[in-house]
Regions:
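Catalytic loop of the DD-peptidase/beta-lactamase superfamily, centered on the K-T-G motif
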Residues: 1-148
Length: 148
């Protein structure tokens, strides 16, 4: 369906032959939003502490140091935390966002970002693996353009 490339449908009830970290992670949009709300609140959701605030800070801090970032996966001006790409510089990135913003996405194009400086998060739920490099930056551009 996406450029003529055959798609393999993942059957969530089948036990995989091999575990794959986040590979095959499935969620509803509402549960994903609640997870992002928890991260935005530094580990708290609905008045319940699920992660310590220092844990969230550690997870979303740059752990690459001076390793250069260059590419679609990790563009200039970014580092990498524990499970997230992290914005480290204001002017070096080709996409908008505040220093401290963190994000990640799935193989089929789903993506999210949390911008602590603006106290917000956004997510895009798509299933277009061959077009994710087009839609992800467009999504972030559109979100930040709407804030102006």
């Amino acid at each position: 369906p996406d450029g003529g490339v055959p798609m393999k449908v993942i059957e969530p009830r089948e036990v995989p032959a091999m575990e794959s970290g986040g590979g095959g992670l499935m969620s509803t949009a509402m549960d994903y939003a609640r997870f992002l709300q928890c991260l935005r609140n530094k580990g708290e959701l609905d008045g319940v502490r699920l992660l310590g605030p220092h844990t969230v800070d550690f997870m979303t801090a740059d752990h690459l140091g001076h390793t250069p970032a260059d590419g679609v996966l990790l563009p200039p001006g970014h580092g990498f935390g524990l499970g997230f790409a992290v914005r480290t510089h204001a002017g070096m990135s080709p996409v908008p966002g505040s220093v401290g913003l963190y994000y990640w996405g799935g193989i089929a194009g789903t993506t999210f970002f949390v911008d602590p400086a603006l106290d917000m998060y956004a997510m895009l739920m798509i299933q277009a693996p061959n077009q994710r490099d087009y839609y992800r930056p467009l999504f972030r551009d559109m979100v930040y353009a709407a804030l102006l």
